[in-house]
A protein has these predicted regions:
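Flexible, glycine-rich phosphate/dinucleotide-binding loops
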Residues: 11-12, 37, 62, 72
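Non-catalytic, surface beta->alpha helical segment in thiol-disulfide oxidoreductase systems
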Residues: 55-77
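Local sequence-structure signature of Cys/Sec-based thiol-disulfide redox active-site neighborhoods
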Residues: 1-24
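Thiol-based oxidoreductase modules, predominantly thioredoxin-like and allied folds used
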Residues: 4-8, 25-38
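Generic recognition of short, well-ordered alpha-helical segments
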Residues: 14-18, 40, 67
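Structural micro-motif
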Residues: 45-55
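N-terminal beta-loop-helix "entrance" segment that forms/cooperates
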Residues: 38-45
């Protein structure tokens, strides 16, 4: 499982990044939404705004796309 964190440098981005960095047993990738990598990822996954969390399985299938912290916590519970 790969947790992708698209950030914008705001408080919400920091909270999401901090939570995801603390998750055990998952790969994590943090990207600045304004970077070329971030823009490419957003285009590829239909993300129109950041911050955003996109969780992918091993095959690249989207399991979760959210900015909602409660939804994120529930998913990993």
């Amino acid at each position: 499982m790969l947790v992708n964190v698209l950030t914008t440098g705001d408080d919400v981005s920091e909270k999401l990044k901090t939570y995801c960095n603390g998750l055990p047993d998952v790969d994590k990738k943090v990207m600045d939404a304004a970077s070329d990598e971030g823009k490419g990822f957003m285009a590829a996954h239909g993300v129109s705004a950041a911050p955003m969390i996109v969780v992918l399985d091993e095959d690249g299938k989207e399991l979760l796309k959210t900015i909602n912290m409660d939804e994120l916590v529930k998913f990993f519970a």
